[in-house]
Amino acid sequence: MESYSQNSNKLDFQHEARILNGIWLITALGLVATAGLAWGAKYIEITATKYDSPPMYVAIGLLLLCMYGLSKDINKINAAIAGVIYLFLLSLVAIVVASLVPVYAIIIVFSTAGAMFLISMLAGLLFNVDPGSHRFIIMMTLTGLALVIIVNAALMSERPIWIISCLMIVLWSGIISHGRNKLLELAGKCHSEELWSPVRCAFTGALTLYYYFIGFFGILAAIAITLVWQRHTRFFH
């Protein structure tokens, strides 16, 4: 009986680890896709080089509506809808950031963050690190910072890109730490509730992380805009 219980716990742990790795993979692909969509938006001229481009305001409005809808109950969404909403959010974020920041900077920052998730996931599988542990989060943060140094040094990036890249890694590490219990809860639903398939758990987890990212990113953007506005008004006074 004890052996059966141990085997059952081991299987549960393996299922949860597989789902968490799925979340890291989808998040990695989402960040790289955001960079690609930003490039595409710029290429087909959906965005503009000035801050008051209409598409940016439309995208921000749609983002706010999506965030409000997801805040009601993100767990009621099935796998297919979660995937569609995830792609929609990626596209909206891509339009907003491409309207504010040079595309090459977006590609560097978002792709580096995506590589952090992918490499950390593979390293966790290789060295048998629990993907839901604090140790894994620390490993991911260090991996991300190492990638920032390697990529930006190789490309001889300007100082603002170095700073934004580092902040992006720290931001995602904070998001994962903040949402860790939520992700573990989602991973546990797979073997405790019939309606929760591994695919649904993984997509809902990735959508939850991106939801947190947009929220934190929006707060930081609001702070930055406030500081710029204060400096602007001081200049004219």
Curated annotation (Swiss-Prot):
Keywords: Cell membrane, Membrane, Transmembrane, Transmembrane helix. Pfam families: Bax1-I. Coiled coil: none annotated. It is a multi-pass membrane protein. GO terms for cellular component: plasma membrane. The keyword Cell membrane applies. Its main location: membrane. This is Uncharacterized protein YbhM. It comes from Escherichia coli (strain K12).
